[in-house]
């Protein structure tokens, strides 16, 4: 049995004292050997962490001791090696950045749809199904029939909706994302924009993959995740993708055969667009990573591009 538990969690809840929560939360993570990144904002908490079974249980016991977080849910998967390099708790304006004032999932959200009911909803021809994730995530897997907004960050989602859809014509809208947070916030935005019947997948793609048998699944491909596994398959086992440190795009087995793929430095997606300064920085970064690996030391550089997607 694998020893590392990976827990994805979020909850929209008003945390007026979120600044004061940072230090005790960080200490709880450190005391229990839990790694990863958690985001705190006045609107709630979001993140993905990993550790031993005991460490993860201790973290959630601490979180749930706060009445505001007593019902916080999370999704678990498992791996053989620690997928995070560092332990961080960041203070943010939003736990997932949409950038539209007044959007508040604590006050208004769409209708939650359980994983077991999702297939029936998205099979309805009157339902517009939108993938709220970024383009590089959608490229490696999505639901059958889903629209790809081709956004590079969640901040672009509102403009995409304004440019393509009309509440008067698009009566039913269903949305999904990796763990549920982006589509929940998107549903709040959509309601504010005048859309009336707005649905979103409770627990996101990860909950769907966990609960729906593969033979009944309408999911196609792998699912991008926010840790060093890069992707997971339908059974939540680690996929075969790597990730380019320069552009953050997932890199397939085929991509790694390209002459433009240099581990840690470039891939076929970004080779033509990299400046020499960026290449030089990437080479130095990769050199430090390899030296740390040879010494069996933690990742030497504080910021891992994989974790930045939490905020976008």
UniProtKB/Swiss-Prot annotation:
<comment type="similarity">
    <text>Belongs to the TrhO family.</text>
</comment>
<keyword id="KW-0560">Oxidoreductase</keyword>
<dbReference type="InterPro" id="IPR036873">
    <property type="entry name" value="Rhodanese-like_dom_sf"/>
</dbReference>
<dbReference type="GO" id="GO:0006400">
    <property type="term" value="P:tRNA modification"/>
</dbReference>
<dbReference type="GO" id="GO:0016705">
    <property type="term" value="F:oxidoreductase activity, acting on paired donors, with incorporation or reduction of molecular oxygen"/>
</dbReference>
<feature type="domain" description="Rhodanese">
    <location>
        <begin position="123"/>
        <end position="217"/>
    </location>
</feature>
<keyword id="KW-0819">tRNA processing</keyword>
<dbReference type="Pfam" id="PF17773">
    <property type="entry name" value="UPF0176_N"/>
</dbReference>
<feature type="active site" description="Cysteine persulfide intermediate">
    <location>
        <position position="177"/>
    </location>
</feature>
<dbReference type="InterPro" id="IPR020936">
    <property type="entry name" value="TrhO"/>
</dbReference>
<feature type="compositionally biased region" description="Basic and acidic residues">
    <location>
        <begin position="282"/>
        <end position="293"/>
    </location>
</feature>
<dbReference type="Pfam" id="PF00581">
    <property type="entry name" value="Rhodanese"/>
</dbReference>
<dbReference type="InterPro" id="IPR040503">
    <property type="entry name" value="TRHO_N"/>
</dbReference>
<dbReference type="InterPro" id="IPR001763">
    <property type="entry name" value="Rhodanese-like_dom"/>
</dbReference>
<protein>
    <recommendedName>
        <fullName>tRNA uridine(34) hydroxylase</fullName>
        <ecNumber>1.14.-.-</ecNumber>
    </recommendedName>
</protein>
<comment type="function">
    <text>Catalyzes oxygen-dependent 5-hydroxyuridine (ho5U) modification at position 34 in tRNAs.</text>
</comment>
<feature type="region of interest" description="Disordered">
    <location>
        <begin position="282"/>
        <end position="312"/>
    </location>
</feature>
